[in-house]
């Protein structure tokens, strides 16, 4: 297991799931929060994120497949998307990619989903498809 990113809300690891490369997202305990409140927040965010990722797929938007969710450990195993973060693109694909991101965000909003953290670090381009990742702060509107 290899740490890919240490975030404010969760740590992201490259691992494997049933013989495939996978992402493991772990929501770590926050020592500065009341333990009961911390547990509830991490558990609710894990459940909400996995549900929204699956729901958004039904709109025709590319998101990672969710393989497994452990609500007790506040962990989620997902498909590893090998590609480039949008923030790292520095070629003519940027305009096309930005237009596609606009369409994706419009589709999300039209279908009552607010991502909650739209940054170039939360989109991955693989071949000609734009994948949306990190629905940890997403909400249904």
Regions found by a protein language model. Give the residues of each.
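Conserved hydrophobic "DFG−1" position in protein kinase catalytic cores
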Residues: 14-17, 68, 80, 125
């Amino acid at each position: 297991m290899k740490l890919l990113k240490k975030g404010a809300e969760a740590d992201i690891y490259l691992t494997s799931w049933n013989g495939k490369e996978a992402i493991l997202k772990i929501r770590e305990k926050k020592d500065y929060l009341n333990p009961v409140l911390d547990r509830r927040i991490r558990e609710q965010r894990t459940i909400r994120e996995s549900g929204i990722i699956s729901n958004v797929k039904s709109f025709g938007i590319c998101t990672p497949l969710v393989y497994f969710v452990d609500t007790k450990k506040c962990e989620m195993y997902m498909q590893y998307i090998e590609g480039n973060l949008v923030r790292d693109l520095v070629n003519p694909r940027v305009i096309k990619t930005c237009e596609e991101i606009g369409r994706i965000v419009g589709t999300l909003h039209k279908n009552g989903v607010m991502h909650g953290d739209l940054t170039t670090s939360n989109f991955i381009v693989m071949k000609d498809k734009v994948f949306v990742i990190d629905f940890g702060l997403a909400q249904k509107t």
